[in-house]
Amino acid sequence: MISSKPRLVVPYGLKTLLEGISRAVLKTNPSNINQFAAAYFQELTMYRGNTTMDIKDLVKQFHQIKVEKWSEGTTPQKKLECLKEPGKTSVESKVPTQMEKSTDTDEDNVTRTEYSDKTTQFPSVYAVPGTEQTEAVGGLSSKPATPKTTTPPSSPPPTAVSPEFAYVPADPAQLAAQMLGKVSSIHSDQSDVLMVDVATSMPVVIKEVPSSEAAEDVMVAAPLVCSGKVLEVQVVNQTSVHVDLGSQPKENEAEPSTASSVPLQDEQEPPAYDQAPEVTLQADIEVMSTVHISSVYNDVPVTEGVVYIEQLPEQIVIPFTDQVACLKENEQSKENEQSPRVSPKSVVEKTTSGMSKKSVESVKLAQLEENAKYSSVYMEAEATALLSDTSLKGQPEVPAQLLDAEGAIKIGSEKSLHLEVEITSIVSDNTGQEESGENSVPQEMEGKPVLSGEAAEAVHSGTSVKSSSGPFPPAPEGLTAPEIEPEGESTAE
């Protein structure tokens, strides 16, 4: 009788394969048999690709090579982790290995070291990108590779840059060059800058001296700024004297006068006041001076105009542009006048020195007073004085002196010239008849221009002159400016 039940045919090698997986499960004892079985067959398939042999021999050899290692517990955990996601097993198992190898290479260490050095040198430019890239590199690697970056090997000195460079702009080279340029401009050529400022701050009028007196003339240059800055004035002559002149600010100082200038007789017309020329030394025996003076009587300005002062060997003539004041010396006594007198006359002062002085002054205020024995002229102006003095010829060389704290000038010789900013000229009829106890005259400033011997008179804008060879009368009351006290006629007579 024929049975209707079909006959099942077992494929070749199925029994051997099932026996192999059963042995592997028994030896390794995995927690998840399904994942382990999948990993087993995957490894077996990969292993079979390398060899072409019978299934029985393949399973037997696979057990000897792979399953025996799994039974020791070295790789089953890794196999189980790989079995969690069978589709990504190969990718995940290879990427961490490659990153680990890349972080251990020498090239990676070198690049990270150089990058850290750059970050230290230029934090303002590379700090943010460096941080982002470091974080990116750390995120790509499965193992922490930051210790190598945080502790780089010994680096060159640029890593020891001071922290202040971390806050400089993006281009520190330009900033440094700019700062150095400013410093050099401040510290270089200070005298030139001062001279330029002075020259442009006030008009300057220069008169030429006749050729017959050129050998003996001395031009004094005293450029001053109305704001009261202390400037350096060089007095150069045959004795090469260096004088420093200081100015003090006054309440009633004003802008330089722009009144039209009236030339003296037999002299050239002064240049226009368009732009003040830069003061320079004309010769070894010439010095140019520009002084700002202001005259006040009882804190009230008296007159304003342009004054040209010409001092000849026997007289001083001061013609004014708007108003000309004349003050003649009288031997007879007159009562002291408290109020200033201004009259359209020329000012004449007899002098005893054989020197010839010519000065052109731009005057703002002038005050004239007559006393019993004194003649005074108060002036405050900006002037350029050309002085010719024969008594200065042949004097011993006087070294340059520095300006003291009070703005006075000290020259260590009796035959010296002291210059000041303010001027008050007092002429005495008979200074020789005065008592010897009145030699000293109170001055608002310590510096006094002193001319030796015959040089008793001088008209300096912003200066005071005192003769060293005769007594001096006391200053009259009610005067607000320093005084010029030239020696009287008694020395010549």
From Swiss-Prot:
Residues 141-152 have a biased composition (Low complexity). Residues 85-164, 244-271, 330-354, 426-493 are annotated as: Disordered. Keywords: Calcium, Cell projection, Cilium, Cytoplasm, Cytoskeleton, Flagellum, Metal-binding, Nucleus, Phosphoprotein. It holds the Pfam family RIIa. Its main location: cytoplasm. The keyword Transcription regulation does not apply. Residues 484-493 have a biased composition (Acidic residues). The modification Phosphothreonine is found at T151. Residues 12-49 form the RIIa domain. The keyword Ribosomal protein does not apply. One of its GO terms (molecular function) is enzyme binding. It comes from the Eukaryota. Changing T146A: Does not affect phosphorylation. InterPro entries: CABYR, cAMP_dep_PK_reg_su_I/II_a/b, DD_CABYR_SP17. One of its GO terms (cellular component) is nucleus. The modification Phosphoserine is found at S155. Isoform 1 is phosphorylated on tyrosine residues during in vitro capacitation. Isoform 3 and isoform 5 are phosphorylated by GSK3B in vitro. Dephosphorylation affects its ability to bind calcium. It is found in: Cytoplasm, Cytoskeleton; Cell projection, Cilium, Flagellum. Interacts with FSCB. Isoform 3 self-associates. Isoform 3 and isoform 5 interact with GSK3B. Isoform 1 does not interact with GSK3B. This is Calcium-binding tyrosine phosphorylation-regulated protein. It comes from Homo sapiens (Human).
